[in-house]
Amino acid sequence: MAKPKIAVIFYSTYGTNHGVAEHAAKAAEAAGAEVRLRRVRETAPKEAVEGQDAWKAQAEKMADIPEVSHDDMEWADGYFFSAPTRYGVSASQLRAFIDTLGPLWQAGKLANKTVTATTSAQNVHGGQEATTLSLYTTAMHWGAIIVAPGYTDQSIYDAGGNPYGFSTSAGGFDDKGRAAVAHQAKRLVEMTRKIRG
């Protein structure tokens, strides 16, 4: 049986979602998947990025990670998304990439793929669940199959109890969070394997 192909796709301003994505990629590989770790293209003006030392440092840290492409979306059997929350939805950088996927969607090339999502926000009640649900709404339009973690492992409870997908306050990716992300990535691989046969 071929290994499930998982694209771990992230956008990160200050590093939280980068850390989540790297951990998810390692966990998916450990669960038997072939993995591509991809970052979303930065669309903010250069002066905005360079005007904040932490943002600039994070952009430099991620520079060697390939940008996600339509080829990656077509290649993958499943997607693990991680992006920060902005006003109750995903950061515009991720939304901008998703908005380019019309040709793949129209050709049915996003249908029957598995999807799971994680996020972070500045505050505990800063729209984290809404962000994850909005990504799942997009997946429904694609005809994709949502693989939420639910309450299928103690790690979900330990990390705050979000059944839609791991979420955290900015900078709060600790050992409990890593365990929850590893479980979510492993579950994505397992469900993708079952669906792909």
Language-model features, listed with the residues they occupy:
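Phosphate-binding/catalytic loops
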Residues: 120-124, 159-172
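Short aromatic-enriched loop/helix-cap "lid" or pocket-rim segments at secondary-structure transitions
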Residues: 47-51, 129-130, 158-161
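N-terminal beta1-alpha1-beta2 submodule of the flavodoxin-like/Rossmannoid cofactor-binding fold
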Residues: 1-106, 164, 169-197
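Short, glycine-/small-residue-rich phosphate/pyrophosphate-handling segment
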Residues: 111-157
